[in-house]
Amino acid sequence: MLNSEKMVASIGNQDLDHADKYFKKALREDPAEVLVELGQYLESIGFLPQAQEIYEKVRFDFPEVNVNLAQIAAEDGDIEEAFLYLDAIPEDSDDYLSALIVKADLYQMEGLTDVARDKLLEASQLSDDSLIIFGLAEMEFELGNFEQAIQYYAKLDNRDLLAMTGVSTYERIGKAYASLGKFE
């Protein structure tokens, strides 16, 4: 049994002392691929410092963890560091799309909605994912570009979006028309 597996079992048994010992051994002895999986698990259950330590160790072999590191840095309020991690992901990487989406989110958090929109526009050139289109619609709405927001909302399947986000495109389109002074 790998140290990572022993750590997970110890966490499940609420034996954090043993979990910490197995964590340290895992960092020294377990294969990098296993560490990435452990990092993802630890991140998902809120053990962010441990996940971060793993990601820092493997980030040059697994550059996709830079997205995770950026999210952890943002959680800690270190937006500048988050951008540094995201900038380490090259445009030809499979993870570049994820990096753009996280960048858009960070710019949005910083109140730079125009820049966030630009990042989502770039992401929309790489993928037609409905959540990217939804993000663009929401940003256009927030910026007061209601006609553009309506066009984006109209591209979305209301049932799918409602199930994913709890947001009705019909309601958003209605609000956008109302903001334009068109009440019919």
Q: Model-derived features: where do they sit?
A:
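Canonical tetratricopeptide repeat
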Residues: 5, 37, 68-71, 102, ...
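Start-of-helix register in tetratricopeptide repeats
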Residues: 1, 33, 64-67, 98, ...
